[in-house]
A protein has these predicted regions:
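Short linear motifs embedded in intrinsically disordered, charge-biased segments
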Residues: 1-205
Length: 205
């Protein structure tokens, strides 16, 4: 029995989503580096650079993000990766003593409303949960099913649906009933996907 394998381009591991997220960050960072000449080109506007980054870099990171189980460590990695991308585009290093809040303000001023990458991931997960809950296929059976047998010793591992319960504040039948209402779930997903405000600091370590 193997503990890790690759399926349809995604890393499946019995240790959770960390390896897959790290791999996606590495792939997206490589794409970011290959486009360095664009980021350094002063003839290209900042708003255009930001659109290109979101189209050509974060698009590499996001596939299958709906399947990830997030924890604090993974969320910090996602946030740090996003800030690293914007700093590269802006030509700002950590030695410049510019906070992440200031980076976001510069991005917002150049490209309009700012939606955190982590919020995009959370919203996609919530949207997928609603889609599966309203369906009738195997995905719904697996999502709502239980594994027979006794649970092993120690603290239980964080599950995919733990994220949904934590973000929405709902559990059990109440969660399922809300998800079955397409319009109501869309509104809840917008609110529940919001990322708590982080303290001002230069970087996420």
């Amino acid at each position: 029995m193997v503990s890790t394998f690759k399926y349809l381009g995604a890393i499946i591991s019995d240790e959770g989503s960390k390896k897959e997220v790290i791999c996606r960050i590495a792939q997206a960072t490589a794409a970011l580096t290959k486009l360095s000449t664009i980021w350094k080109d002063k003839e290209i506007s900042l708003s255009t650079k930001i659109r290109l980054m979101r189209s050509l870099v974060t698009s590499i990171f996001l596939p299958v993000c709906e399947s990830w189980t997030l924890n604090k460590d993974i969320e910090k990695r996602i946030h740090a990766f996003e800030m690293r991308c914007y700093r590269r585009i802006l030509g700002i290093t950590y030695r410049d003593r510019v906070t992440n809040i200031q980076v976001v303000e510069k991005v917002r001023a150049a490209a309009g409303p700012f939606v955190e990458l982590l919020r995009v991931v959370r919203k996609r997960k919530l949207k997928w949960f609603g889609h599966v809950t309203r369906g009738t296929g195997l995905s719904k059976t697996i999502l709502q099913g239980t594994v027979p047998g006794k649970r092993g010793r120690g603290r239980p591992r964080r599950t995919w649906t733990d994220n949904i319960r934590d973000w929405t504040g709902l559990e059990g039948d109440a969660l399922l009933r809300r998800a079955e209402n397409r319009k109501g779930w869309r509104k809840l997903a917008y609110v529940a996907s919001a990322v708590p405000q982080r303290p001002i600091r230069l970087r996420d370590r």
